[in-house]
């Protein structure tokens, strides 16, 4: 019977002892309380149980020879108490775990409170008191190291001496593991021969079935007491996978190399950068965690971060229900797949039910095929109709008459594309069919009637709103050199300039004949050189024709755009059949036909509708063209956009284009002046030889009071000659709206005061537009040249760490003075908020840091997260350096203002280790410039609308 059960039996049977025994609950302990015995018939049985309980140890369940009693009054045998206090060095009660400072060994159990321990013998080292000398002798005997095999007892002072004696004298050995972990007396040790010791270590003892040997660590080839000790060793000295361990797997690895292979095979292991030398932290359970780590720690740019954030997820959709009479994209795919596999015929199934199923399936397939065929037919029909419309646009209109306002508005609303394209192909006057001989060959054109006639319907000013709206809105989409061609859009290659539109309208006495006589140039004052616009970008196409009103041939001839040599040959053929003009220049080139019309050089320099619409861009507002016209205008460019070459004569001729009647200006008595020779024209980016001077001295010039001398225009820059090769520039058509940097040097001197022609009032239809404000002075335009827009701040690499290093450097230079550092932070905050100007901030920081300010200024400027504030601080630094050089007596080569307006060269001139981004104007360190430049790769191909609006504003 177990000792606890025996104690409970004694509690029920013996009224002399009140025992509360609970071995597993320390709060309820067994206490021996002396009570007065009741003399009942069962006293003899209770006394027997009492003796049995008192003679058995509750720990080792052996008979108690000597009792060990503490203040908790839980008696145990003296052997168990000695093991705990001497061998294990533990002084608590094994029953209730109460700390026992003193223990008394007695032959009979007594209450500890009744004992007078001061009269007992004592072992002060272990705080054990003995009831008499025999008890003390018995305590010392169980602690002796005595040889069990010698006939004569041999006692050794230490166990090591006994072990050596047993090995040498008796060739017996004890188990080292048992000796280390088992706290037992020397006489309880087992001694083995070599063979028995090996069996004990591997399998256990034959007489002790509870011991199954000591487990072996296969990594270290060492054995441990039991599995618990082996597990401690594995987790302390070897490696295990913390992912698999959380799932309950017990797998261990000898070193980290094998564990990393397990991470690589079963999990996700990062081996980039610093992670190749780290342990545990660079392994991840799932792919999501792995990619999140790569995006956070190893992404060098946005593209890699975006790639790392992508997760491959497969979705499995349930099959959709069969739809009836509903056709979708998947149905077309199913039809195509079904047709590729071979469509079976009807009724081929072996049985009636199979035929029924096959017939139903084919019925659905036929419905889907029918829907697909109808859709394809509608698309082809639409395409044919668009081609027919294109062909109809090639046929000239027999008559041209002015329409009422209501009819024209209705037509433009109902057919915006067709009406605009048709009106764009009209010329001033009635043109016969032979004027359009399949874009080239034909008979001489019929006489052209004058367009300056009284209209049948009175026109209102509202019919001619300003053109600036469309001009401003048109460049919102950048023009690209390689644009997809639509079926319904007309390109320049389809409609080259027709020579019939350039034929003069009037004899030499008409006011509009100056366009044809002088090569489509206004006549200037005598001996004034004229530089004509010679650049036509490749994007100038027939979209001008399709988006503007009819052009009078006498006032504004069609420009010859730089497209191909084939088109030039066509023009030569068509011009050869024209009637000779009334007045020709006798000094024309020898290569030209004397009976031909205008030369290609003259045609190329004729202003276009875009020139005239640009004339109203400066301060006026323009009419909103239809959507088709606006889209086509985005692909056009004009060499004279925004240039001051537009005169009131141009405005008066524009009135002819808009079908607005205008009175003829009176002729003046000024002497005629020969025109200046033309500059080299550029077609398709190739400079041609200039034609000979077309000035004549035999015909009178009709210079009215509404005409002004034409000012020179800047020669085409290198960027404008090849607009498709320039990336960081405004779209074609808006480059020339702003004069170039050195445009002032090419301008001729203005006429003397008083000799400039007066400006007449604007023509009818343009009264709401202040024309005088449209002609800008080139000097003003040069000053107001737009600078690249300042972009948002893009954070460089290691931004946080560099900020911390910068703060630490500033603290070190300030000698860790918190007052000065707080003052520096206050200055920085005021500068960021705009309360402190950059110059004052620069001086304040220089006063705080002294000479050390130059050491931290470069990093302070680069890490300033505001591009505009960076430029201000950079300018302040440049001003200070320039002032410092002036004080030293050295004069700078350039003015301060220009030196700081040169972008990237400014930082190098100031000995700064930084560079300014030409795109967003952010100041960058040299090591960050290449990484920052890659962020703008896509910006050149797709500029933002805000950036373009800033350019044109």
Curated annotation (Swiss-Prot):
GO molecular function, a single term: ribosome binding
Zinc finger (C2H2-type) stretch: 215-238
Localization terms from the record: Cytoplasm, Cytosol
Residues the record lists as Phosphoserine modifications: 489
Pathway: Protein modification; protein ubiquitination
Biased composition (Pro residues): 747-765
Biased composition (Basic and acidic residues): 381-409, 655-666
Main location group: cytoplasm
PANTHER family named among the record's database cross-references: E3 UBIQUITIN-PROTEIN LIGASE ZNF598, ZINC FINGER PROTEIN 598
Name this polypeptide is given: E3 ubiquitin-protein ligase ZNF598
Source organism per UniProt: Danio rerio (Zebrafish)
Gene it is expressed from: znf598
